[in-house]
């Protein structure tokens, strides 16, 4: 099944995508991870992406579409994967429909105040890039990774100032996707304000229903 996870930053779609990719053996394609890989490798594209992200802006469609399309073309099983962070707007959605058929959409619903709390509490390991949250997914030892004992840090775009810009961009560009997919009966809403285990359970129920139809 080809799944697209929609939702604002901080809705938990990335965390759930990683969990389900392990349980269902789906390939997890995260635009955020793809961008970070380019940044870490200091590619020309990575340098451009880094500047855009640090300014709290969304990466342009031309770059995003190319990165995602290239990645999809490299995976072995193109029938079972999760797209996390793509598409972000109508133009990207149209391009995705051109590339793939029978896409199912999961829309993560969550209150904006809770989003800010989640994102401002997010911490990432400098060594292994595992993601934690001081509010919802704390480490056993403060600011130390549970997996590799690396040092945790807060991304520049997770500060409250950058978050305001990111949420404004989301409301402007990504929210219209809800109507786009709802009109074609592909939208499946899920309450993302609950804890990870509950969200995962509810999502598995939705996936089961989709498979039966």
Curated annotation (Swiss-Prot):
Subcellular localization: Cytoplasm
Cite the Pfam families for this sequence: ADK, ADK_lid
Task: Provide the E.C. number(s) assigned to this enzyme.
Answer: 2.7.4.3
Spell out the residue ranges making up region: LID: 121-158
Major place of residence: cytoplasm
Annotated binding of Zn(2+), by residue? 125, 128, 145, 148
Residues that bind ATP: 10-15, 122, 131-132, 194
On whether Kinase is a keyword of this UniProt record, the answer is yes
Reactions catalysed: AMP + ATP = 2 ADP
Q: In which pathway is this protein known to take part?
A: Purine metabolism; AMP biosynthesis via salvage pathway; AMP from ADP: step 1/1
Q: What is this protein called?
A: Adenylate kinase
């Amino acid at each position: 099944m080809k799944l697209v996870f929609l939702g604002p930053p901080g809705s938990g779609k990335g965390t759930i995508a990683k969990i389900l990719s392990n349980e269902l053996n789906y390939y997890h394609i995260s635009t955020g991870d793809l961008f970070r890989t380019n940044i870490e490798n200091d590619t020309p594209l990575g340098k451009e992406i880094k500047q855009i992200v640090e300014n709290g802006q969304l990466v342009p469609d031309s770059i995003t579409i190319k990165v995602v399309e290239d990645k999809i073309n490299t995976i072995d099983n193109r029938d079972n994967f999760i797209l996390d962070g793509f598409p972000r707007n109508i133009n990207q959605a149209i391009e995705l429909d051109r590339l793939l058929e029978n896409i199912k959409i999961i829309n993560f619903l969550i209150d904006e105040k809770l989003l800010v709390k989640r994102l401002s509490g997010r911490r990432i390991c400098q060594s292994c890039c595992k993601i934690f949250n001081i509010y919802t997914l704390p480490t056993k030892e403060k600011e130390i990774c549970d997996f590799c004992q690396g040092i945790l840090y807060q991304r520049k775009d997770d500060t409250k100032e950058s978050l305001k810009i990111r949420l404004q961009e989301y409301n402007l560009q990504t929210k219209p996707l809800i109507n786009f997919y709802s009109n074609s009966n592909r939208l499946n809403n899920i309450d993302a304000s609950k804890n990870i285990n509950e969200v995962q359970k509810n999502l598995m129920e939705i996936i089961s229903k989709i498979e039966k139809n």
